[in-house]
C-alpha cells in the first residue's frame, strides 16, 4: 500500500509539471502571435507592445516554474 501512495505522488508531480509546461507553451505561442499581429497593424506602437509583451510573458512563464517547484517538493519532501 505504501508503494501505491508513492507511485501516485510521483504521477501527480509528473502530471502537474507536464501540464504546466504544455499550458505555458500554448500561452506563449498565442501571446507571440498576438504581439506580431499587433506589431504588423501598428508599427509605431512596437516599443509599447514589446514592453507589455515581455511583462506578460514573464507572468505566463512564472506559472510552470512554480509548478516545477511544487512538483519537486511533492516528489522529494512529501514522498
From Swiss-Prot:
Keywords: ATP synthesis, Cell inner membrane, Cell membrane, CF(0), Hydrogen ion transport, Ion transport, Lipid-binding, Membrane, Transmembrane, Transmembrane helix, Transport
Organism: Yersinia enterocolitica serotype O:8 / biotype 1B (strain NCTC 13174 / 8081)
Transmembrane segments: 11-31, 53-73
Site (Reversibly protonated during proton transport): 61
InterPro entries: ATP_synth_csu_bac/chlpt, ATP_synth_F0_csu, ATP_synth_F0_csu_DDCD_BS, ATP_synth_F0_csu_sf, ATPase_proteolipid_c-like_dom, F/V-ATP_Csub_sf
UniProt-recorded name of the protein: ATP synthase subunit c
Organism superkingdom: Bacteria
GO MF assignments: lipid binding; proton-transporting ATP synthase activity, rotational mechanism
Membrane topology note: Multi-pass membrane protein
Pfam annotation, one family: ATP-synt_C
Signal peptide segment: none
Gene Ontology CC: one annotated term: proton-transporting ATP synthase complex
Subunit structure: F-type ATPases have 2 components, F(1) - the catalytic core - and F(0) - the membrane proton channel. F(1) has five subunits: alpha(3), beta(3), gamma(1), delta(1), epsilon(1). F(0) has three main subunits: a(1), b(2) and c(10-14). The alpha and beta chains form an alternating ring which encloses part of the gamma chain. F(1) is attached to F(0) by a central stalk formed by the gamma and epsilon chains, while a peripheral stalk is formed by the delta and b chains.
Function: F(1)F(0) ATP synthase produces ATP from ADP in the presence of a proton or sodium gradient. F-type ATPases consist of two structural domains, F(1) containing the extramembraneous catalytic core and F(0) containing the membrane proton channel, linked together by a central stalk and a peripheral stalk. During catalysis, ATP synthesis in the catalytic domain of F(1) is coupled via a rotary mechanism of the central stalk subunits to proton translocation. Key component of the F(0) channel; it plays a direct role in translocation across the membrane. A homomeric c-ring of between 10-14 subunits forms the central stalk rotor element with the F(1) delta and epsilon subunits.
Cell location: Cell inner membrane
Family membership noted in the UniProt record: Belongs to the ATPase C chain family.
